[in-house]
């Protein structure tokens, strides 16, 4: 099956379609690139297809911040339009403007 194109770019702020968290994209895999063990731990009835982009997020919920790995089908644009509260944001991004983060110049390729 064909691989779909990434809907969100580096620095985009997104939220999960089902679970209560949001985050900023810091890396994108064109298709699933995590372990089979990780994939198999997802309940089968909600397990996403592997042939779609997967996003690495600096994520936050009401309680904590963490790194999340999420399929494109489970992400939506964030409508809060505020910055993400994660301690690593300042290490990767410069400013937050117009609802997205600008990647630090030294990290761009």
Over which residues does each language-model region extend?
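Short, solvent-exposed secondary-structure boundary/capping segments
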Residues: 32-41
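A short beta-strand motif that forms part of the nucleic acid-binding face
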Residues: 27-30, 61
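Generic detector of isolated residues embedded in canonical secondary-structure elements
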Residues: 22-24, 56
């Amino acid at each position: 099956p064909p691989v779909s194109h990434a809907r969100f770019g580096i620095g985009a702020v997104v939220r999960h379609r089902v679970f209560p968290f949001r985050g900023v994209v810091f890396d994108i895999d064109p298709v699933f690139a995590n372990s089979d063990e990780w994939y198999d731990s997802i309940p089968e009835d909600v397990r996403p297809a592997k042939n779609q982009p997967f996003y690495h997020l600096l994520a936050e919920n009401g309680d904590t911040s963490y790194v999340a790995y999420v399929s494109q089908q489970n992400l939506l644009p964030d409508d809060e339009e505020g910055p993400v509260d994660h301690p690593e944001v300042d290490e990767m991004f410069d400013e937050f403007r117009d609802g997205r983060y600008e990647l630090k110049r030294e990290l761009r390729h």
